[in-house]
Regions:
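Conserved NTP phosphate-binding and transfer environment spanning the P-loop NTPase/kinase superfamily
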Residues: 1-169
Length: 171
C-alpha cells in the first residue's frame, strides 16, 4: 500500500501521507477490495507476473538532506532492478522485500559516502513497524471484502519486523 504526500497539484493537506499515490482512487469503478482480489487472481501456476519495485527517492538524513543524489543517478538503481528481474543479482532478503546486496549497485564516480549508502539500504524496524501498522489500518477500511491474502501478507511482514526475543538456554 504505497503512500505519498500530496503535491501542489493535488488536493489535501501538504505533508499528510495519503494511501493513493497514483491518485486513482476516485476513478476506480468498483470496490477496492474487489480490485485487489482481481489483481491477486493473476497469481497462478505458470503465470509470468510483473516485477514490482518500490523506491523512495526522497529519503533524507538527520539534517534534512536527501540521501540519494537523484536525477540521472537514478539509472544506477534502475540498472539494479533490471539485473534483479533478469536474475543476475540475488539482492538481500529483508522483512520488507529484497534490497540491493553488497556491491550490487554500480557506485563508481558517485559522491555518496558509506554512511549514506548504509542508511539508504537499512531497514529501520521501528519505522517499518509504524508503516506496517498504518497499512493495516488502511486495509481494514476495505473489510469485509479485503482478500485474506493481503491481510496475511501485512501480518507476515509485521511479525518479521518484530521477531520474538531470544530465549536463554537452560543450563
Amino acid at each position: 500500500a504505497m503512500g505519498s504526500e500530496p503535491t501542489a497539484a493535488a488536493t489535501g493537506a501538504v505533508g499528510v501521507l495519503r494511501r493513493d499515490p497514483m491518485a486513482m482512487k476516485p476513478f476506480c469503478g468498483y470496490h477496492y477490495g474487489d480490485y485487489f482480489r482481481h489483481w491477486l487472481s493473476f497469481d497462478r501456476p505458470g503465470a509470468k507476473l510483473p516485477k514490482i519495485f518500490h523506491v523512495n527517492w526522497f529519503r533524507k538524513d538527520g539534517n534534512g538532506r536527501f540521501l540519494w543524489p537523484g536525477y540521472g543517478e537514478n539509472l544506477r538503481v534502475l540498472e539494479w532492478m533490471i539485473a534483479r528481474a533478469q536474475g543476475t543479482v540475488p539482492g538481500r532478503e529483508t522483512p520488507v522485500g529484497i534490497l540491493p546486496g553488497a556491491g550490487e549497485l554500480r557506485l563508481d564516480g558517485l559522491d555518496l559516502g558509506r554512511a549514506a549508502l548504509d542508511e539508504l539500504l537499512a531497514v529501520d524496524p521501528a519505522g517499518w513497524q509504524a508503516e506496517i501498522a498504518a497499512i493495516g489500518e488502511y486495509l481494514e477500511g476495505y473489510a469485509p471484502r479485503l482478500p485474506p491474502a493481503l491481510h496475511a501478507e501485512q501480518q507476515r511482514v509485521a511479525a518479521a519486523l518484530n521477531p520474538p526475543p531470544l530465549q536463554a538456554a537452560a543450563g
